[in-house]
Swiss-Prot record:
GO terms for cellular component: ribonucleoprotein complex; ribosome. This is Large ribosomal subunit protein bL34. Keywords: Ribonucleoprotein, Ribosomal protein. Belongs to the bacterial ribosomal protein bL34 family. GO terms for molecular function: structural constituent of ribosome. The keyword Signal does not apply. The keyword Manganese does not apply. One of its GO terms (biological process) is translation. InterPro entries: Ribosomal_bL34 (IPR000271), Ribosomal_bL34_CS (IPR020939).
Length: 44
């Protein structure tokens, strides 16, 4: 059986990247929450 995690930098960035997060209201909320929490990495 094939493993479920098949890493791809492009797919990772397009799905979870900063620009993608900023496109939607919910994504901006995610970034804001991570900023408020003091995360070192806001997005991938």
């Amino acid at each position: 059986m094939k493993r479920t995690y098949q890493p791809s930098k492009v797919k990772r960035a397009r799905t979870h990247g900063f620009l993608t997060r900023m496109k939607t209201r919910g994504g901006r909320a995610v970034i804001a929450a991570r900023r408020a929490k003091g995360r070192k990495r806001l997005a991938v």
